[in-house]
């Protein structure tokens, strides 16, 4: 029997009332994964033996009635280190690496009774927006297996949307949670920068990376954010701010709430059908009592250029540690130390990672630092200021999550610029360190369309309030791909 259509609150009631055991639920989840994985390819590793052992231990001690996540399974993106479980960031260079420690979020999952059932596929080192840059295999879209699932948290989104797992963790550097959530018709949140510890997250771009939850519904998303949030002394960028109950405003009405609609998010390059769905969603929020007005974010058009300079520069520095000596892939038939470095990195890194390392190294070079990296930092400040100005008058910003629905597998592999432009609407949120969510808001040609809601720093509660109000009065989140029911 499959339980993949039940919320974690419903599953918790079954567990507390002993209508099902954690072991039975885990076995059912493993069956769901086994049935769908050949078509989806969301997992790099399923930790069956470990998961069953943890579930049996939870049954032995008894379900905690006060912890809604106790005994529930979760998938974890493969750039989040897990003690004793191979962690590769979907890269050949980290093949076979078994971490001796847990990421802070991995510990928090265990402390909340969540069972890590496996490691999820992704674009290599989180560099990509389609899931096709995995060095192991490409994940498929849950709605149409000929389409991309989005990236870089490809497995995190597809596993939830296809009914393999109810919950997953991803990471978001320029849209890597929100974009695949949109493409797969689920809920994905990038928290405020610093809200969730990055300790144990394999770094891509340290000033932009953030771990976040992917789930079928808004409430479950908030429940998972409750688990992973909080200050961590091991992460110098972790914020020592109070962690509220993120579910506290869910169910409250949104009358009088002011929502901004940036005209730049509906301009050139935005698919007409996507635009139509998002404007209809804005009208729906107006019917619920919100005040929706057009605004301008004039510097958002520079976001993609700024992002690829800053992110690639930080990546070129972060990825220096993968040298073929301390751990991971080591080239054979080498002549000297330099040859070892060059061959190990050339053979171990995929083409997109190499492209970004070269771009970043160029941007940081003596002749380009002021012209590119420093200038990008200045424009980043202008983007931050644009958001701050809008948030003086408005509670939230609304727009499409992506310019288009999911495209065909292979369609943009040889066109990195068009791939980069797919993150046009999500990137500014990372540059400004703001929280942003994607929720299902319609369909275009049978494929899901995501609506993005952007909030003030540390105000994920208001995002969840509006997202839940929309979800409660629409049916988009109830629609499921064919594979879900298999």
From Swiss-Prot:
Q: Locate the active site.
A: 77, 152, 176
Q: Name one Pfam family in it.
A: Amidase
Top-level division of the source organism's lineage: Bacteria
Biased composition range(s): Low complexity: 150-159
Entry GO CC: glutamyl-tRNA(Gln) amidotransferase complex
EC number(s) stated in the UniProt entry for this protein: 6.3.5.7
Q: Where is this region: Disordered?
A: 131-159
Q: Which family does it belong to?
A: Belongs to the amidase family. GatA subfamily.
**Job of this protein:** Allows the formation of correctly charged Gln-tRNA(Gln) through the transamidation of misacylated Glu-tRNA(Gln) in organisms which lack glutaminyl-tRNA synthetase. The reaction takes place in the presence of glutamine and ATP through an activated gamma-phospho-Glu-tRNA(Gln).
Q: What is this protein called?
A: Glutamyl-tRNA(Gln) amidotransferase subunit A
Q: Which organism is it from?
A: Lactococcus lactis subsp. cremoris (strain MG1363)
